[in-house]
Regions:
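Conserved SAM-binding loop of SAM-dependent methyltransferases across substrates and taxa
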Residues: 67-80
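Conserved beta-strand signature within the Rossmann-like core of class I S-adenosyl-L-methionine
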Residues: 149-160
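Active-site capping/gating segments
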Residues: 109, 159-197
Length: 197
């Protein structure tokens, strides 16, 4: 992905903010600190490869955003998209708010649990989630949003196949599993047309 100098500078500022804040608040795992660019920035950026090409989706919601991963990275790369970031933990929410202000991102941030965010508040979205919940629970959490036409782009680790099989015991859904560009054992799962069995 080619990016402008301005975008690259924003990503670098964000990366440095993340590393500095991580000294006081557990935002990212200690083992990933030395490889933040690939492990977090690039990993999050690849979600954009799977955003719908049509103009029906002009916003995304990052649920359980944590350090703003992937939401902040996606917003920096695609500033024209409306961004909703949901994080209930105050310290993590505060970090996201600080990054939003310092980088002039104009994101809408909610210090709230996602189950309290109604589709009527944020509309139809691309739903992003990274390292949040098993797929079965994730679909339960987001089901009301799928009912209004949202789609999901979920980062999943090495147990992705098991998660899909478990989710299929309770849910009917269409999905595509794309090999992660940063870890060939992980997948980016694109989910839509979710129904209860």
């Amino acid at each position: 992905m080619k990016i402008s100098n301005e975008v690259e500078n924003k990503l670098l500022v964000y990366k440095n903010m993340l590393l500095e804040a991580n000294k006081k608040t557990n935002l990212i795992g200690v083992r990933t600190i030395k490889n933040v660019w690939e492990r977090h920035i690039c990993d999050c950026a690849q979600a954009l490869n799977y955003f719908p090409k049509n103009k029906k989706y002009t916003s995304f919601v990052d649920i359980g955003s944590g350090a703003g991963l992937p939401g902040i990275v996606v917003k920096i790369l695609r500033e024209e998209i409306t961004a909703h970031l949901v994080e209930s933990n105050y310290k993590k929410y505060s970090f996201i708010a600080r990054a939003n202000s310092q980088l002039f991102l104009g994101m809408k941030i909610y210090q709230e649990r996602f189950e309290n965010i109604k589709p009527s508040q944020i509309g139809k979205n691309v739903i992003l989630a990274r390292a949040l919940l098993p797929l079965k629970k994730l679909l339960n959490l987001t089901f009301d949003h799928f009912k209004v036409g949202s789609i999901g782009i979920f980062h999943k680790g090495v147990n992705w196949e098991k998660e899909i099989k478990e989710a299929q015991t309770l849910w009917k859904f269409d999905f595509d599993a794309h090999e992660s560009l940063t870890n060939n054992k992980s997948r980016i799962i694109v989910v839509n047309s979710v129904e209860k069995k």
